[in-house]
Swiss-Prot record:
It comes from Zygnema circumcarinatum. Keywords: Chloroplast, Electron transport, Heme, Iron, Membrane, Metal-binding, Photosynthesis, Plastid, Signal, Thylakoid, Transmembrane, Transmembrane helix, Transport. This is Cytochrome f. The keyword Electron transport applies. InterPro entries: Cyt-f_TM, Cyt_f, Cyt_f_lg_dom, Cyt_f_lg_dom_sf, Rudment_hybrid_motif.
Amino acid sequence: MQKKDVCEYITKWVSVTISTLVTIGVLVFPLSSEAYPIFAQQNYESPREATGRIVCANCHLAKKPVEIEVPQAVLPDTVFEAVVKIPYDKQINQVLANGKPGGLNVGAVLILPEGFQLAPPERIPPELKEKIGNLYFQPYRPEKSNILVVGPVPGKTYSEMVFPILAPDPSVNKQAYFLKYPIYLGGNRGRGQIYPDGSKSNNTVYNSPVTGTITSITKNKKGASTVTIITTDNREVVELIPAGPTLLISEGDTVKADQPLTNNPNVGGFGQADAEIVLQDPLRIQGLLVFFASVVLAQIFLVLKKKQFEKVQLAEMNF
């Protein structure tokens, strides 16, 4: 009985210690909404919802365009490239987690059809490796090799990314078929506005929670602001604003509920795109070539036969 109590005590002590360390880690090293692929992997079983919406849009609220280019058709067991473009103005800077300006990072999630996967290094030709650069791709889940994520990586270098993809061979993979398949892309530039727990990052606008008068605004050494608002019923409401957004209000100003207290510093955004690719059957191509060849030969024989008939007619007329 005493041994059981000791085990329970040790278990509780370990649990409390781990919880304390995690709490301290969050306070000392605040979350960076720059690590968007990790957030999606940790919180969602699949990156694409039943509605077709990619879950990255839950944290990255602004919409921006993305592009994807793939071949119209590929042969089985061949390596092809999927080109992902995440365009943005390279001259602009974003607000970093510490409130200072910095360059934008980019990231992407590529949802391939079942059976398609990242090409192994030994199958990637040298010219394709040169296009890929130092990008590191990883599967969304160990069991989901058809879903690839990359980033965050520097946007100035990788606003255009090349994914090396290996097409499946239906003769080996019985889950693959010679069909037309959709490919889905989610791409982002810049940091998010909301963390997975629902809290705001410093890369978004902060609004007044109540209607009232601003009585004081204080800033700490790190640039964060504490805004005190007295409501019409004489309640004191304190709004904490992290370093990054620019304050639009001053002491003595009257504000309404949901009125912006800061600007919106976000310059990035998330976008979705899709494409289609055909897994082509080589026998079908061979059959098509044979058909075209037979049509050409038939036309040639028809012309020759016609000329021969004309010669016979001409000979009969001369006779």
